[in-house]
Curated annotation (Swiss-Prot):
Residues 433-602 form the Helicase C-terminal domain. Residues 895-1042 form the PAZ domain. This is Endoribonuclease Dicer. It comes from Homo sapiens. The keyword Repeat applies. The modification Phosphoserine is found at S413, S415, S1016, S1160, S1460, S1468, S1470, S1868. GO terms for cellular component: cytoplasm; cytosol; extracellular exosome; nucleus; perinuclear region of cytoplasm; RISC complex; RISC-loading complex.
Length: 1922
């Protein structure tokens, strides 16, 4: 459209092109298609890029608005031409010369060139010095440097003296070249050029060609002159002409508004009053000293503002502004101290009130009266009416706009804010983010000159909208330059103002408001959408302001309207002519300008005649591209290619004229498009047609290669043509809620039973196998751990032991340890004899004894379980063995079994009566190896004791330890009414028989193999030597049990042994299955081979130093103990304690257990937040036991109030109430072989969530030793038969496989986390390499989409499930009484339900838990977050070592669990009530039992009776990161209520419940296990066998295929899992022959260079200078194209021979991740999983990579043409140089400490990190896929960092803050700042708010966190912002 610009139009004739009236219909160019994609021209590229093109093409003078683009163009041009200057100067190599005007500019240019290139730069700024140099001296300089930067005077001297001739210069750059017009050395230098035959390329840079008002003629002359002098063409940047020189120009209209006639005379009256007042103030000639403030200043300002508003907008607005000013004045008056000033302010105040009064006489201020506004305003409203959307009347009515009911719109009180619009705004509009296309079709800006004009005009428009339905659609806002300026000092008030402005811009960008009234600030630099209406309310006064405001009208159809008063219109016309002329001159200079007018084809003509459209399926009207739409398609396609925030990829089109006057175009797509060749179109009659036709041809090509889909739209990454990669699986149908693959979704699986133990019950007269369970004490318990000074009993000292009788052979498995009270016992399972038969009687006897062991000795029988060996899944028998008649051969001990059958004490208590006549006779030998039973109490389940010692010096008449009784005899008489017949028998010191049946891990170590804290040795010694702490029994009152103590001690180990055996066999079976499926390892092991022992990778010798006596609860060493550690005590009861694992991943811990490791073991430290006063009504001793025993430390709290900070609550040595049952809460209950202290993940990862010192806890178990052995490739020396075999060939050690199957929740001595991490990174590497090699044409976006699909948890979970892993996994703590099914037992369906409730002992246990589950927890009550509990009534249990450890832990967990209502059969989630100071636990069903009295004896408790937990709510279980029972997590208000209403009930003995994600983790861990044991090829084959393709398949013939049924469908989860496994093994044994040939090896993609006529020459040009880089990294590329590709950014279109670096970066990223992870994994320090994770994320991240890239000069070789990227890199490099040392962890390094207010973190250019990765990918490909080579190059670069971080693991600021302030830190959502960045505020409740700004949410968030941390650490709490 030609602008009907210059003739003033009357409004009547004004035909606006509004979107509604436009012929294209209202949908065209709607503003919310923010970055509208151009449809008729190619997407324009950045102007600096176009200027660079021009400069490369010919001599150019670049006219820029600012200095910013100048260096970019100069440096890039130098780099592009640098191949000419790398040569030797003596052999006519050339040099580049930069000329600057003054010495101080030299350094600036030097640093720019040095930063961005590796060229050698010489600087010459001092004429005096340089003038004296000789030719030789200069020659040295020229030889040494390639770029010479000199002041013009030095240069002139050098050239004139002929030291350097112009023909030696390839490029001459003139900075500030406009000086050449004057008489200046520049001119002289150019004169020298005139006679020079080979003149250098010339680049002139100027920013000041246009300053202020200037005459177009002069300007033109100036430019021409300059062009002539510099022999160049001037090119202007688009920021001097309308910004987007391609879009259709806005339609420019000048509107004459006519004169203002005011009939009422009010206008004149007000004007007169104001002028008088102003004159009066001006006349007050108060002498103003320069030092003092001018008293009249404020008054003058206010009155003149008021006058201006009156003149521009009229009386109605003047009244409004007077109202606002009165309010503002009140503030000044209030604060003004000085009398004179105050008088002036009061004068002004009165005067403004007078104005208001005058106005009120004429109109009511509440409604808008258009008689009292100026014609300009009226015209403006008319224009706005035309923009009213013409469909769907806004919401049927205008109510929503008119609900302001103030009678008086301007309130005169000072209580209101200076613009109450802000507040009203919120109320008056409902949510306006509806997407109706017509809501905000207007997107307009009105430019005004003064701030007040903007404020009042906005108010006026809102008022008009209320009264005129035509204007109701407008939602306006104003923005004034106030406070947006970059560098004013900010105070709080300005900050607030600034935020307000930003909010306004945000709403405008989001099109929540559709009209912005703005002062000139918005002309420049502010990021706002393309507008379709720009109104200049006040006329522009200079060219720049004209162009910039016009440049805001960038929507495809837009109007630029200038409102002029009649008197101004003449002079403005002149100005406008000038502006137009200047614009025209500059536009001609604008590179590549296409003057739209002439070339426009008449749109009516049917273009299809010119060139036929490309149509798909012509018959049924399929999609088509026509010559008119083709360009739009190409633009859209380019916009979808992957790129970074700095590069907007656009096509490049060159049009040339042929001699016959026709034109043809060549189209180049961005270099990461698969369509690489340029496309040449046919000759056409005009430029525009040529461009369109070539686009059409290109669309056709793109569609043919699959880049456009069948709707001719760009193919997204999802619509992959690589379907086979995404092997689309049917989503399994389950009723289980939750997203597949996530932690939230859990399902139940049967526990696997190893094939060799299934149906293994021996039958009479059938061959049997007899295995011996060998037990040898390998590491006796060291003295410092032997608290009771107990004698150690090595199991090998007694010959009688246990064996296993089974019908099937058991494969060889590694020996493994169990940990008894005597220390570490190594268990072996050795075949004794096979093929023998047994009679029925013998078998029955054996079976009875087997049942006796489990039901009576171990007391594992319960109503839910029934002994049915014939029905049981696994029913081998356990039986006693002994040596046969003094030989050393073991055999079945039938005699012993018969003796037991006969014994009276076998089950109950024998009823021997002693009398005076037949007194008791004491025989010492009977008591030497005995278990005794007190006969006088607990008749139903008598307690059993080992005899520890016989006190021959004590008798029943000795003194009783406690004062209540004189002697032992008196005690028994008084208490039990028992008389003794023998008063000189000795007394017995006894120990409880062990109730702790989980012996898988040592209990003095935590799960990491670190010692738990002990109390001091003296205290312990004193305690154990005092009789008070011993249990003393009288032999006469006890019966002797038929089972000797030595055998009993072995029996206690049976559950752990059988369980571990079971797990190892499951693992062995998986190893064998993988051997046949994947061809990795052998199916069955050689007979003479046994794997190295299973061990936890802990040091064998537990050296005494590791037991640290803790004397200060928060001492430094404390960090080594898990902050929330718990102790595994020796009775079953407390095994649960360790299950704190459930706390995994809780950022919010409700209990601060930091001080639980307290100095005196009998006390519990509870940290209570200081405001927890709810507790004080409670006196602690009231609930402690008052039994008959005494405690060594009975310091009860006397007060009834907790001291605020660390109060100790005594906890008595706990009776063992089986907390572990509760714990099955984890409900992945499985006979898991695990009993360790605390989930690793929890421990190290988040242990310090609730500690305030933020130091990570470094205590985690390293991978099992065999991992190390395998890595180091050495075998254990004791395994002599294994020499000659290795796990590389046989397959991984079952112990390692077991580790990979064990979750941290199982609390075993090992878990899968380290392996999982290694597997995770190898998986990423394997898949990445596969995709990279298989799809050489796919760009990075597609590759990473395919990768993310393959490695997603959801996919891995599916594959793991298909492989049958869930049944084999070990997911919960091994807890024999709760979730272990002894051999021969079955779960009795009928009884199991009742069993869970009607257990006699249960109520006692319940009593111990005064917990309460409160269904309706309303409040998130942060103060009372600390859990408090009363110490429940306790029983002392002298059997166990708790006193030595901290019962608190145990107690804390018990209470936590009990309080959690874990007994309820189905629990739906409900958070805990912490409002009560103690929990009361409401008993389900039997609440009346709550009052049952306790007997006060200390030995009357049964540990094994707790079955309550068979029904659990898995949604509550904690496996990875779900909620812990009883923990309320304030960050999730709904606390998972929605996720967890499902309750799954399942049987703990035979099933387990697993979260999908854990299965995915397990797959990764197995991969890690195969990788460490068998190497990379094996790991790849393993992946292929899972169904993850990472190797190419070699096609086999169909016949072979028929032989190999698909191995997909084996092992689904039926009960008969192993049956199908057997089938699988048969089926796959045939195929294993073909295995290795089935998968080939990956081939390197053949071409890395495109076919190109002179590719090699181009390559050499492009990589000139790279040899220096190769030297630096110490690697020479064989194929240099990889090197070029690695450094080519997508914006670098000069590289036509290779791809850009994105694909290599995709590859390199995975390679570095894997190499670094592998290096960390293999570190001899054996980092724990949490530390590994932290180290990995600290080392594998963009910041580190970018910093290293800069350190090793990658940036100097980087090839990109992107101005923004150039600046970011520039900043970053400068920053790195200043800092000069590497930064940890954080993706944004900080600039300066001072600039606190709005700290911007320096941005790390992602591109730098990318090329660091892409180079790794390039080396990998170039070296023939050798990881070693990559590591040789990269390890030296990374080593210092790896060392530094390993020594001191960095954490991300966000994580550190959350760990430091888990409850109180809250991050705000992102806000946009006015320049388009993101701001995040983090509020630390009570400590202040901290803001961070950055280009993305992540960057901003970490900036905010960093500032918060800095402030918290400096410990000066900021004043919280209101």
């Amino acid at each position: 459209m030609k602008s009907p610009a210059l003739q003033p139009l009357s409004m009547a004739g004004l035909q606006l092109m509004t979107p509604a009236s436009s012929p294209m219909g209202p949908f065209f160019g709607l503003p919310w298609q923010q970055e509208a994609i151009h449809d008729n021209i190619y997407t324009p590229r950045k102007y600096q890029v176009e200027l660079l093109e021009a400069a490369l093409d010919h001599n150019t003078i670049v006219c820029l608005n600012t200095g910013s683009g100048k260096t970019f163009i100069a440096v890039l041009l130098t780099k592009e031409l640098s191949y000419q200057i790398r040569g030797d100067f003596s052999r006519n190599g050339k040099r580049t010369v930069f000329l600057v005007n003054s010495a101080n500019q030299v350094a600036q240019q030097v640093s720019a060139v040095r930063t961005h290139s590796d060229l050698k730069v010489g600087e010459y700024s001092n004429l005096e010095v340089n003038a004296s140099w000789t030719k030789e001296r200069w020659n040295q300089e020229f030889t040494k440097h390639q770029v010479l930067i000199m002041t013009c005077y030095v240069a002139l001297n050098v050239l004139k003296n002929g030291y350097l001739s112009l023909s030696d210069i390839n490029l001459l750059v003139f900075d500030e070249c406009h000086l050449a017009i004057l008489d200046h050395p520049y001119r002289e230098i150019m004169k020298l050029c005139e006679n020079c035959p080979s003149c250098p390329r010339i680049l002139g840079l100027t920013a000041s060609i246009l300053n202020g008002k200037c005459d177009p003629e002069e300007l033109e002359e100036k430019i021409q002159k300059l062009e002539k002098i510099l022999k160049s063409n001037a090119e202007t940047a688009t920021d001097l002409v309308v910004l987007d020189r391609y879009t259709s120009q806005p339609c420019e209209i000048v509107v004459d508004c006519g004169p203002f006639t005011d009939r009422s005379g009010l206008y004149e009256r007000l004007l007169m009053e104001l002028e008088e007042a102003l004159n009066f103030i001006n006349d007050c000639n108060i002498s103003v000293h320069s030092k003092e403030r001018d008293s009249t200043l404020i008054s003058k300002q206010i009155l003149s503002d008021c006058r201006a508003v009156l003149v521009v907008l009229g009386p109605w607005c003047a009244d409004k502004v007077a109202g606002m000013m009165v309010r503002e004045l009140q503030k000044y008056i209030k604060h003004e101290q000085e009398e004179l000033h105050r008088k002036f302010l009061l004068f002004t105040d009165t005067f403004l009130r007078k104005i208001h009064a005058l106005c009120e006489e004429h109109f009511s201020p509440a409604s808008l009266d258009l008689k009292f506004v100026t014609p300009k305003v009226i015209k403006l409203l008319e224009i706005l009416r035309k923009y009213k959307p013409y469909e769907r009347q806004q919401f049927e009515s205008v109510e929503w706009y008119n609900n302001r009911n103030q009678d008086n719109y301007v309130s005169w009180s000072d209580s209101e804010d200076d613009d109450e619009d802000e507040e009203i705004e919120e109320k008056e509009k409902p949510e306006t983010n509806f997407p109706s296309p017509f809501t905000n079709i207007l997107c307009g800006i009105i430019f005004v000159e003064r701030r007040y004009t903007a404020v009042v005009l906005n108010r006026l428009i809102k008022e008009a909208g209320k009264q005129d339905p035509e204007l109701a659609y407008i939602s306006s806002n104003f923005i004034t330059g106030h406070g947006i300026g970059k560098n004013q000092p900010r105070n709080k008030q300005m900050e607030a103002e600034f935020r307000k402005q930003e909010e306004v811009l945000r709403k405008f960008r989001a099109h929540e408001t559709n009209l912005l009234i703005a002062t000139s600030i918005v002309e420049e630099g502010v990021d706002i959408p393309k507008c379709n209406l720009v109104v200049r309310f006040d006329l522009p006064t200079e060219y720049r302001s004209y162009v910039q405001s016009k440049g805001r009208a960038r929507a495809p159809i837009s109007n630029y309207i200038m409102l002029a008063d009649t008197d101004k219109i003449k002079s403005f016309e002149e100005d406008l002519k000038t502006y137009k002329a200047i614009e025209k001159i500059l536009r001609n200079k604008c590179s590549k300008s296409v003057d739209t007018g002439e070339t426009d084809i008449d749109p009516v003509m049917d273009d299809d005649d010119v060139f036929p459209p490309y149509v798909l399926r012509p018959d049924d009207g399929g999609p088509r591209v026509t010559i008119n739409t083709a360009i739009g398609h190409i633009n859209r396609y380019c916009a979808r290619l992957p790129s970074d925030p700095f590069t907007h990829l656009a096509p490049k089109c060159r049009t040339r004229e042929l001699p016959d006057g026709t034109f043809y175009s060549t189209l180049y797509l961005p270099i990461n498009s698969p369509l690489r060749a340029s496309i040449v179109g046919p000759p056409m009659s005009c430029v525009r047609l040529a461009e369109r036709v070539v686009a059409l041809i290109c669309c056709e090509k793109l569609h043919k290669i699959g880049e456009l889909d069948d709707h001719l739209m760009p193919v997204g990454k999802e619509t992959v043509k690589y379907e086979e990669e995404l092997d689309l699986h049917d989503e399994e149908e389950t009723s289980v809620p939750g997203r597949p693959g996530s932690t939230k979704r859990r399902q139940c699986y049967p526990k696997a039973i190893p094939e060799c133990l299934r149906d293994s019950y021996p039958r009479p007269d059938q061959p049997c196998y007899l295995y011996v369970i060998g037990m040898v004490l390998t590491t006796p318990l060291p003295d410092e751990l032997n608290f009771r000074r107990r004698k150690l009993y090595p199991p090998e000292d007694t010959t009688r032991c246990f064996g296993i009788l089974t019908a099937k052979p058991i494969p060889q498995i590694p020996h493994f340890p169990v940990y008894t009270r005597s220390g570490e016992v190594t268990i072996s399972i050795e075949l004794k004899k096979s093929g023998f038969m047994l009679s029925l009687q013998m078998l029955e006897l054996i079976t009875r004894l087997h049942q006796y062991i489990f039901s009576h000795i171990l007391r594992l029988e319960k109503p839910a379980l029934e002994f049915k060996p014939t029905d049981a899944d696994s029913a081998y028998c356990v039986l006693p063995l002994n040596v046969v008649n003094d030989s050393s051969t073991l055999d079945i001990d039938f005699k012993f079994m018969e003796d037991i059958e006969k014994s009276e004490a076998r089950i109950g208590i024998p009823s021997t009566k002693y009398t005076k006549e037949t007194p008791f006779v004491f025989k010492l030998e009977d008591y030497q190896d005995a278990v005794i039973i007190p006969r006088y109490r607990n008749f139903d389940q008598p307690h059993r004791f080992y005899v520890a010692d016989v006190y021959t010096d004590l008798t029943p008449l000795s003194k009783f330890p406690s004062p209540e009784y004189e002697t032992f005899a008196e005690y028994y008489k008084t208490k039990y009414n028992l008389d003794l017949t023998n008063l000189n028998q000795p007394l017995l010191d006894v120990d409880h028989t062990s109730s702790r049946l989980n012996l898988l891990t040592p209990r003095h170590l935590n799960q990491k193999g670190k010692a738990l804290p002990l109390s001091s040795a003296e205290k312990r010694k004193a305690k154990w030597e005092s009789l008070q702490n011993k249990q003393i029994l009288v032999p006469e009152l006890c019966a002797i049990h038929p089972i000797p103590a030595s055998l009993w001690r072995k029996a206690v180990c049976l559950p752990s042994i059988l369980y571990r055996l079971h797990c190892l066999l499951t693992a062995e079976e998986l190893r064998a299955q993988t051997a046949s499926d994947a061809g990795v390892g052998v199916r069955s092991l050689p007979a003479d081979f046994r794997y190295p022992n299973l061990d936890f990778g802990w040091k064998k010798s537990i050296d005494s130093k590791s037991f640290i006596s803790i004397s200060n609860s928060s001492s430094a060493e404390n960090d080594n103990y898990c902050k929330h550690s718990t102790i595994v005590p020796e009775n079953a009861a407390h095994q649960g304690a360790n299950r704190t694992s459930s706390l995994e991943n809780h950022d919010q811990m409700s209990v601060n257990c930091r001080t639980l490791l307290s100095e005196s073991p009998g006390k519990l430290h509870v940290e209570v937040s200081a405001d927890l006063t709810a507790i004080n009504g409670l006196s602690y001793n009231q609930n402690l036991a008052n039994g008959s025993y005494d405690l060594a430390n009975r310091d009860f709290c006397q007060g009834n109030q907790l001291n605020y900070y660390k109060q100790e609550i005594p906890v008595q040595p706990t009776t063992s109430y089986s907390i572990q049952n509760l714990y099955s809460y984890e409900n992945q209950p499985q006979p898991s072989d695990e009993c360790t202290l605390l989930s690793n993940k929890y421990l190290d990862g988040n242990a310090n969530k609730s500690t305030s010192d933020g130091s990570p806890v470094m205590a985690v178990m390293p991978g099992t030793t065999d991992t190390i052995q395998v890595l180091k490739g050495r075998m254990d020396s004791e395994q002599s038969p294994s020499i000659g075999y290795s796990s590389r060939t046989l397959g991984p050690n079952p112990g390692l496989i077991l580790q990979a199957l064990t979750l941290s929740n199982a609390s075993d001595g090992f878990n899968l986390e380290r392996l999982e991490m290694l597997g995770d990174s190898f998986l990423k590497h394997a898949i990445t390499t596969y995709l990279f090699c298989t799809y050489p044409d796919a760009h990075e976006g597609r590759l990473s989409y395919m990768r993310s699909k393959k490695v997603s948890n959801c996919n891995l979970y599916r594959l793991g499930k298909k492989k049958g892993l869930p049944s084999r996994m070990v997911v919960s703590i091994f807890d024999p009484p709760v979730n272990w099914l002894p051999p021969g037992y079955v779960v009795n369906q009928d009884k199991s339900n009742t069993d869970k409730w009607e257990k006699d002992e249960m109520t006692k246990d319940c009593m111990l838990a005064n917990g309460k589950l409160d269904e309706d927890y309303e409040e998130e009550d942060e103060e009372e977050e600390s859990l408090m509990w009363r110490a429940p009534k306790e029983e002392a249990d002298y059997e166990d070592d708790f006193l030595e450890y901290d019962q608190e832990h145990i107690r804390f967990i018990d209470n936590m669990l009990m309080g959690s209502g874990a007994f309820v059969k189905k629990i739906s989630l409900s958070p805990f009530s912490t409002t009560d100071s103690a929990y009361e636990w409401k008993m389900p069903k039997k609440s009346s039992l709550g009052s049952m009295p306790f007997s006060s004896d200390f030995e009357d408790f049964d540990y094994s009776s707790w079955d309550a937990m068979c029904y659990l709510d898995p949604s509550k279980a904690v496996e990875e990161d779900d909620f812990v029972v009883g923990f309320w997590n304030p960050s999730e208000e709904n606390c998972g209520v929605d996720t967890g209403k499902q309750s799954i009930s399942y049987d703990l003995h035979t099933e387990q419940c697993i979260a999908d994600k854990s299965i995915a983790d397990c797959v990764e861990a197995l991969l890690g296990c195969y990788l460490t044991s068998c190497g990379e090829r094996a790991a790849q084959l393993f992946l292929c066998s899972l169904g993850l393709k990472v190797l190419p398949v070699i096609k086999r013939t169909d016949r072979e295929k028929a032989l190999c049924p698909t191995r997909e469908n084996f092992n689904s989860q039926q009960k008969n899992l192993s049956v199908s496994c057997a089938a699988a093994s048969v089926a796959s044994s045939r195929s294993s022959v073909l295995k290795d040939s089935e998968y080939g090896c990956l081939k390197i993609p053949p071409r890395c260079m495109f076919d190109h006529p002179d590719a090699d020459k181009t390559l050499n040009h492009l990589i000139s200078g790279f040899e220096n880089f190769e030297k630096k990294i110490n690697y020479r590329f064989k194929n240099k194209a990889y090197l070029l590709q690695a450094f080519t950014h997508a914006s670098y279109h000069y590289n036509t021979i290779t791809d850009c670096y994105q694909r290599l970066e995709f590859l390199g990223d995975a390679i570095l991740d894997y190499l670094i992870t592998k290096h960390l994994y293999e570190d001899p320090r054996q980092h724990s999983p949490g530390v590994l994770t932290d180290l990995r994320s600290a080392l594998v991240n963009n910041t580190i990579f970018a910093s290293l890239a800069v350190k090793y000069d990658y940036h100097k070789y980087f090839k990109a043409v992107s101005p923004e990227l150039f600046h970011v890199i520039d900043d970053f490099v400068q920053f790195q140089l200043e800092k000069n040392e590497m930064q940890g962890m954080d993706s944004e390094l900080r600039r300066s400490e001072e600039d606190e207010e709005k700290e911007e973190d320096i941005e790390v250019p992602k591109a730098m990190g990318d090329i660091f990765e892409s180079l790794a990918g390039a080396i990998y490909m170039d070296s023939g896929m050798s990881l070693e080579t990559v590591w040789q190059v990269y390890y030296p670069m990374m080593r210092p960092l790896i060392e530094k971080f390993s020594a001191n693991v960095p954490r991300s600021p966000v994580r550190e803050l959350l760990e430091m302030e888990p409850e109180t830190a809250k991050f705000s959502p992102a806000e946009r700042t006015y320049d388009g960045k993101v701001r995040v505020t983090v509020e630390v409740v009570g400590k202040g708010k901290f803001k961070g700004v950055g280009r993305s949410y992540r960057i901003a968030k970490s900036a905010a966190a960093r500032r918060a941390l800095r402030s918290l650490k400096a410990n000066q709490p900021q004043v919280p912002n209101s």
